[in-house]
UniProtKB/Swiss-Prot annotation:
This is 3-methyl-2-oxobutanoate hydroxymethyltransferase. It catalyses: 3-methyl-2-oxobutanoate + (6R)-5,10-methylene-5,6,7,8-tetrahydrofolate + H2O = 2-dehydropantoate + (6S)-5,6,7,8-tetrahydrofolate. Mg(2+) binds at D51, D90, E122. Transmembrane segments: none annotated. The keyword Magnesium applies. Belongs to the PanB family. The gene is panB.
Length: 275
């Protein structure tokens, strides 16, 4: 029997992220599959199994059609592929906006079946009590203010927020209320840079920016956007790769080799043993 024992790695948890307020910026990316989670794990503090999976992986027009079962399936995959990074799973549209008891049942199922360390909800006046309800019952919650993808049908599209006075005040108050309700961190998405800084200074938990400000306590991007897998890049994304181009080249080379009967070659096929 081998004497080798795999070294146990302690996974980052909500208190670790909360303690990073004002410190070294927190590195976050989205993950939906085990292989990608494995690649990101070494470099990230937090992996978000975002409901953006509906658009990125399943081709939906927005996140409204994402189901709890979909989030559980992808959450399980990301947990299998990662060892160190904290894994947070989005609660999809319709799973938490009603009675807090229903939200708890859905959140508890999500955490039990995935093994994730926390859930994320989009904040708002009707959700603050639910955040408090979940946290009091042992479920770590990450909030989300500003541009809220699940509210896209109400808001009329993916538009930057917080440029006008009343909207700016409302988003700031939602962030404060979310932190006061017990969220361990708050995603701040698609808001004016000055507002993102103001939120970061106003609340005692870390802010995770996406299209917000370098002054946030951490940053997150959709991994597929950052790697250049799509031909359209949102304004707030910096592309660190061109995987769309690289994949296109690789597939074109494969197709050419197949049509020319250069693949498979001697190195990729099996031969019967002599005798």
């Amino acid at each position: 029997m081998s004497s080798h024992r795999e070294e146990k790695v302690r996974r980052i948890a909500a208190p670790d992220i909360a303690a990073r307020k004002g410190g070294t910026p927190i590195v976050c990316l989205t993950a939906y599959t085990a292989p990608v989670a494995e690649l990101l794990d070494e470099h990230c503090d937090l992996l978000l199994v975002g409901d953006s999976v509906g658009m990125v992986v399943h081709g939906l027009p927005n996140t409204v059609g994402v189901t709890l079962d979909m989030m559980i399936l992808h959450g399980q995959a990301v947990m299998r592929g990662s060892r160190r990074a904290m894994v947070v799973v989005d609660m999809p549209f319709g799973s938490y906006e009603g009675a807090p008891e229903t939200a708890y049942d859905n959140a508890a199922r999500l955490m039990k079946e995935t093994g994730a360390q926390a859930v994320k909800v989009e904040s708002g006046p009707t959700v603050i009590d639910t955040i408090q309800y979940l946290v009091k019952r042992g479920i770590p919650v990450m909030g989300h203010v500003g541009l809220r993808p699940q509210a896209v049908l109400v808001d009329g599209g993916f538009k930057a927020k917080g440029k006008a006075g009343e909207e700016r005040r409302r988003i700031l108050e939602e962030a404060r209320a979310t932190a006061d309700a017990g969220a361990f961190a708050v995603v701040v998405e698609g808001v004016a840079e000055g507002l993102a800084r103001e939120i970061t200074e106003a609340i005692e938990v870390p802010t995770i920016g996406i299209g917000a400000s370098a002054g946030c306590d951490g940053q997150i991007l959709v991994t597929d956007d950052m790697l250049g897998l799509f031909d359209w890049t949102p304004k707030f994304v910096r592309r660190y790769g061109d995987l769309r181009g690289e994949i296109g080249k690789a597939v074109a080379a494969y197709a050419e080799d197949v049509r020319a009967r250069r693949f498979p070659g001697p190195a990729e096929i099996y031969f019967a043993k002599a005798g």
